[in-house]
């Protein structure tokens, strides 16, 4: 058992993930063929969901207790509550079956990324919006914000120059963690849209009991999340001098 474990770890260090029982091809080759698709989907999803989430969060946070805040947070809670597979089926029925303006299954073109990206990004945008709102509210209580307002600086300048910049330091952490989730947590969405990514490859491997592929994919997902967390910690230290000093 010890010898087999050492042999397996040695193979991993050399980039050898074993041979797929289903295709008789090296698992490394299968992963390499789909890894780029998963990264592309994750990047597009994170890009638009971050922008939408931050804007909704700022909108709600700067209007705390008003109808703008209640509207924004109601939308955010709805986005978190809706299951991704239900959103996916709804999009397919509307845009692919009824309106016929988007493909039912996903390829690698930009148009085919729209529905999977929306399905994945709704919940992520909602999480970012709620976190941004909390961060905005906390920064608004700081003394330098009150000082800026007392000097007669325009409210828009105070919000975007002082409040927004400082609140984004903590939001970066959430965005980074969501990117790690997108790289490893898009299994359901990729399956619904038949998207050729690592998530759908994992489902195919499970259905065929392709244990070398399953083991390798779980390992890759874990390493991705660890690396993303490390990068987020480094970025947080760079953006926040207090963390760097500690």
Q: Residue ranges of each PLM-predicted region?
A:
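Short, hydrophobic secondary-structure boundary micro-motifs
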Residues: 3-6, 18-21, 87-88, 103-105, ...
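Alpha-helical transmembrane segments of integral membrane proteins
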Residues: 35-68, 107-246
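An internal, D/E-rich "acidic patch" concept
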Residues: 1-54
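Alpha-helical transmembrane segments and their lipid-water interface positions
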Residues: 14, 87-88, 137
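Residue-level signal for pocket-adjacent positions within structured domains
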Residues: 12, 16, 22, 26, ...
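Membrane-water interface segments at the C-terminal ends of transmembrane alpha-helices
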Residues: 8-10, 74-103, 119-123
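Hydrophobic alpha-helical segments of integral membrane proteins
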Residues: 4-17, 27, 31, 71-78, ...
